[in-house]
Amino acid sequence: MIVLLGAGAGYYFWTQQPEEPLPAPISAPEPAPADAPAPQASAQPEVRYPVPATEEAPAKSLPTLENSDPMMRESASTLLGRKAFEAMVRPTHLVRNVVATVDNLPRETAPTRVMPLEPVPGRFIPSPEKNAARYTPYVRVFEALDARALVQRYIESYPLFQQAYAELGFPNRNFNDRLVEAIDDLLAAPELASAPELVQPKVLYEFADEDLQQRSAGQKIMLRMGAENAARVKNKLREIRRELVQR
């Protein structure tokens, strides 16, 4: 499938803490008066990472975004193996959930309700060593992915991802740019000499170090999975990034 386990890989390692409530929706602004001059359309931003050319044309045309789940399930099952797919992947709204997850990872929060992967089994353990051990089987699955095949499937299906990104509210932006940006943000996660200290001011655990707590959602996921797991995930992310930008 796509980059379901690429930039979105960090969601394998989501801690099972209760999700913070979302802020109230922002009301739409009042429409401008009828005689107000129309604003000038802003120029489209430069595309930094064009989608690489496919090595061969897809054998058949793509389904619509609404009907894309069967194709995506088949692709993900082929890449991951059926057993891992059934245990780890949420089987509906795959393209939209991948796009939302990729877009959220570099942000402050990343709601679990739109992630394409099932949370790690078991409850969050505030002991860094014990908590990291829960993720090792998932890291092995991620490491075993064929980066070239993963990116090839993503490229062949790219129009669906771009459409979902436009529907998310970014009609003039390139989703592939956001994907590379999300991968780069994960790769920039701090590499600590020792496990970070956690505190529990209310319901949720937080990093005691304010700098770590202010990091992006994706980087905090990398920190929570433990240094060894994070290093292994970063190695695979580098492979995927090379395939995305050097074709």
Where would I find each of the regions flagged by the language model?
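Surface-exposed patches in mature extracellular/periplasmic domains of secreted proteins
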Residues: 86, 109-117, 149-154, 165-179, ...
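Conserved functional acidic sites
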Residues: 189-193
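Hydrophobic membrane-insertion alpha-helices, especially the h-region
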Residues: 1-8, 161
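Hydrophobic single-pass membrane-insertion segments
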Residues: 9-22
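A cross-kingdom marker for long, charged
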Residues: 194, 198-247
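N-terminal Sec/ER secretory leader and immediately downstream segment
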Residues: 23-130
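Acidic/histidine-rich, surface-exposed loop or edge segments in extracytoplasmic proteins
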Residues: 73-85, 132-144, 213-219
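Mid-length scaffold segments of soluble, non-membrane domains
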Residues: 123-177
